[in-house]
């Protein structure tokens, strides 16, 4: 089962993570360590076979491929190219950093088949394509990082998110029960967008956009 992960945060605040200056970068490193443990460096490939000095200790913890390590953290903070085999781990790390800057996040469980059914139901009820669920991620994040395998990433403005929510709310009673429930949960969260926008102005922050990650 896949997930739709949404974050109410200004896109410029997301882009600012890449190439972040100190001490901001140090704060992000600390946040990474808090979530994933101290960012230990990966064992060099061939050096591990050269002898006891370079060999990985037998009791060393096994690091999953999608678990961020120090190199992932450093690459993101320097705005460097992310190798394809480190994209999954790097996106996990980026999500933690985005969530720390966001006004709120929301996660909805959905797979491709279910999302297609929701989109069809919305269209049948008269919701225009520009207000479809996938239209929430119509804009490129422009971070320079490609999506991981099985992932789609993008964003829309806060105004676009609010407009889409209004379109969904108007036809919710016409949707199939399961689709209406799924949309209803999302509407409850999106309904807070005007308040977050007001709060951002009061704190001299940029108004939140809607950053979206869809995983298969």
Regions found by a protein language model. Give the residues of each.
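Intrinsically disordered, Lys/Arg-rich low-complexity segments
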Residues: 210
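Acidic (Asp/Glu-rich) sequence patches and key acidic residues
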Residues: 1-206, 215-216
